Amino acid sequence: MENKLIWLDLEMTGLEPQSERIIEIFTAITNEDLTEVIEGPNIVISQPTEYLDNMDDWNQDHHSRSGLLDEVKKSEISQEDAELRTLNFIKEHVGKNKSPLCGNTIHHDRKFLTLYMPQLEEYFHYRNIDVSSLKEVAKRWRPEVTMDCLLYTSPSPRDVEESRMPSSA
């Protein structure tokens, strides 16, 4: 169980945790070398239509084109159930407070977790591995390095895979 990393990606109706909601959660667990992957559940969460109707243009377009918006409207999975399913998956593979939370701009996802999935958020170590920060550093210090490996078609798993699998140009 030691040294495993928990990778997480959320899709939300917008960027403001106080007024927006989580509509999809994906989790994967890797070994410390990022060579072994255990994919967790990719859960589309039902949300009241008021949150979907009030999404800004970017989110409306992005989630419509990906098909996620239609999936959210059909989903019968509550936020609480999604939290429990995700937490149960993680508990099978990683002990409490043993892994930092890993992903792209993960500090922002963590804000949503704190509000809407507090049991899950408390399970992670307080540290983060934020791949967005690494990308910004690489862009400035090693611009020849690219991180554009797209191996999945679903939005959340793709984001996690991009975080996990940087490639060199």
Region roles according to the model:
Residues E2-L8, M12-G103, C149-L150:
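Conserved non-catalytic scaffold segment of RNase H-like nuclease domains
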Residues P17, K111-L113, S163-R164:
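Short glycine-/acidic-enriched loop or helix-start segments at secondary-structure transitions
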Residues S78, A82-T86, D109, Y116, ...:
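Amphipathic alpha-helical interface surfaces
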Residues H108-Y126:
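Substrate-recognition/cap helix-loop segment adjacent to the acidic, metal-dependent catalytic center
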Residues R127-R142:
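Short, flexible loop segments at boundaries between secondary-structure elements
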Residues P143-L151:
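Short helix/strand-capping connector loops at secondary-structure junctions
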Residues Y152-D159:
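Conserved small/polar residues in nucleotide/adenosyl-binding loops
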Residues M165-A169:
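Hydrophobic alpha-helical segments, chiefly the membrane-spanning helices
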